[in-house]
């Protein structure tokens, strides 16, 4: 993983949690094929098989850091912060611990035009997919409908094949993998 300096609040928060061992033993508790893999729920460390997860977190939120103009968006392999929905979190503040890694899909122009209309409605026209974004979503894939909605703060730099394997595992009705997929140990590499 590489963390972006352009998102210092999220970067520093994530590094602090890694250094204290907060991610050691947590599950990827929500996996949706052709969309993303989500982890970081501290309750997942000791979760029973089939237990509903996704509510665990620390007692603080991280302010949003959207950096679309700097080329930081939801392309395949992006690391982003999960958050509660707009109905209870209109400020789009990020979860302190929960994160997801984007898989998504490849789009054509027609599909991206539909995404742009959806973004126009949800953001009041403040998020416009750039030419670079459109090209990336047409070649690499990703989740463009999340741009300007969730903070992207890093990317997978090696092991995208592992992300692909995880996003393909069988899941239950709550998108939890039928067999646990666990982060054994997270550590900082300089």
Enumerate the predicted regions with their spans.
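Cyclophilin-like peptidyl-prolyl cis-trans isomerases
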Residues: 1-190
């Amino acid at each position: 993983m590489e963390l972006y300096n352009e998102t210092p609040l999220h970067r520093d928060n994530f590094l602090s949690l890694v250094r204290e061992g907060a991610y050691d033993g947590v599950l990827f508790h929500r996996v949706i094929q052709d969309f993303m893999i989500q982890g970081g729920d501290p309750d997942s460390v000791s979760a029973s098989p089939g237990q509903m997860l996704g509510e665990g977190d620390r007692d603080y939120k991280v302010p949003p850091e959207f950096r679309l103009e700097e080329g930081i968006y939801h392309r395949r392999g992006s690391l982003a912060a999960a958050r509660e929905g707009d109905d209870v979190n209109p400020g789009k503040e990020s979860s302190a611990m929960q994160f997801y890694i984007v898989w998504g899909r490849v789009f054509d122009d027609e599909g991206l035009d539909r995404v742009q209309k959806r973004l126009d409605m949800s953001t009041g026209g403040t998020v416009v997919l750039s030419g670079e974004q459109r090209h990336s979503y047409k070649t690499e894939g990703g989740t463009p409908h999340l741009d300007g909605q969730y903070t992207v703060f890093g990317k997978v730099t090696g092991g995208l094949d592992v992300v692909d394997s995880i996003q393909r595992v069988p899941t239950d009705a709550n998108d939890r993998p039928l067999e646990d997929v666990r982060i054994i140990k997270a550590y900082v590499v300089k």
